[in-house]
């Protein structure tokens, strides 16, 4: 025996917002009308959590307004992919003079469009980096700044760098003291 029934969906985003694909609406006397919603446009996903609204209509209006605001006023900026080469840094007393540094993770930031022009990206590394250095050692940071925000992401060594032998270290240290370089 097969039962059929019609179930209306109360999530206003699903039928009135392009890219909406979920989640849940709810209502209680204590919390009012609420919604947890999700939408994706152009490869960017936004999540929305609302609660405490007085009517289902205000829930619908506010959820649409906030989703539109999020997609219209923020831009996703991609900086580096996980494992992508970022910079070479000098080493101290290493068998190689430089070590390649890469991003530990994908670095993508959703930034208010009004701050795109004043955004600043810096690579923070204290050089020279003492050896030995092992692959995946955190040896620096990528810092993204805009407005009053500073976001930092780890930079990892992409290779192993062994320390020079004893006599080579002494020679390099003397050379550094006299000429100021490794």
Regions found by a protein language model. Give the residues of each.
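Domain-terminus/edge residues, biased toward the C-terminal soluble/receptor-binding domains
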Residues: 1-182
């Amino acid at each position: 025996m097969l039962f059929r029934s019609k179930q209306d969906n109360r999530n206003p985003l699903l039928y009135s917002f392009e890219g909406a694909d979920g989640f849940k609406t709810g209502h209680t006397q204590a919390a009012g009308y609420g919604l947890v919603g999700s939408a994706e446009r152009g490869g960017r996903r936004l999540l929305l959590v609302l609660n405490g609204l007085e009517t289902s209509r205000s829930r619908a209006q506010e959820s649409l307004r906030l989703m539109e605001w999020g997609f219209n006023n923020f831009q996703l900026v991609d900086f580096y992919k996980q494992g992508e080469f970022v910079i070479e840094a000098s080493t101290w007393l290493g068998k190689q003079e430089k070590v390649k540094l890469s991003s530990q993770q994908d670095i993508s930031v959703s930034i208010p469009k009004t701050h795109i022009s004043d955004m600043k990206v810096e690579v923070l590394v204290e050089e020279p980096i003492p050896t030995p250095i092992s692959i995946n050692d955190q040896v620096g940071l990528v810092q993204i700044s805009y407005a009053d925000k500073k976001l930092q992401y780890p930079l990892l060594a992409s290779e192993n760098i062994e320390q020079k032998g004893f006599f080579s270290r002494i020679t390099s240290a003397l050379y550094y003291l006299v000429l100021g370089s490794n």
